């Protein structure tokens, strides 16, 4: 059900795998939790996890110094993967990542200290159904999005039901990507929404 997930990439001997760490513990082998699958994540994330790590393991440009990965998925299956490295990313990495993105049908961003390489786009489009209407959202890498899209649809439906008999104007502070703003706008004369996060 989680539409996003973040993992460390753990290198041990010749093997590489997804990892998390015990809550409140220092990131180390003693607190390591291997995550070949992550049942709390969306089906599309779980389907991609083994394919991504197996493909990256075959290519030294993708494998070497790969430190962490962030997955962001949409209900449609569209996927944005951010691969985070402890090395400078060059043209060889970019070529390898472009091939990987084509093979897996995903969007990839490469990150390293002071670097962000966007291969195609740095967002996905999510479509949420609220009381029979579809709302399209651009969800940008690094910005906040509701982690559970189906629960989000129910939250938006509840908010619209409550707002149905209201009138006047709506002021929304910290609106993010307009998650509540768009569906609620149907119930008000004018809407003013603000956000401090530039990525949202």
Model segments located where?
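Accessory RNA-recognition modules of RNA-modification enzymes
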Residues: 1-200
């Amino acid at each position: 059900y989680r539409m996003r997930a973040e993992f460390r990439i753990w290198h041990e001997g010749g093997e590489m795998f997804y990892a998390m760490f015990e809550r409140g513990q220092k990131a180390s082998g003693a607190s390591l939790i291997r995550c070949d699958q992550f049942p709390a994540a969306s089906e599309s994330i779980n389907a991609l996890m083994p394919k991504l790590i197996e493909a990256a393991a075959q290519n030294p440009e993708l494998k070497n110094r790969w430190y962490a990965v962030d997955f962001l998925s949409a209900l449609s299956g569209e996927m944005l993967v951010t691969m985070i490295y402890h090395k400078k990313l060059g043209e060889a990495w970019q070529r390898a990542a472009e091939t990987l993105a084509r093979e897996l049908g995903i969007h990839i961003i490469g990150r390293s200290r002071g670097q962000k390489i966007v291969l195609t786009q740095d967002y996905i489009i999510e479509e949420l159904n609220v009381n029979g209407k579809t709302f399209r959202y651009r969800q940008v890498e690094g910005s906040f999005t509701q982690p559970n899209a189906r629960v989000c649809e129910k939250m938006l439906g509840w908010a619209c039901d409550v707002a149905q008999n209201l009138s006047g104007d709506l002021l929304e502070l910290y609106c993010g990507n307009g998650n509540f703003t768009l569906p609620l706008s149907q119930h008000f004369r004018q809407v003013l929404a603000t956000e401090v996060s530039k990525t949202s």
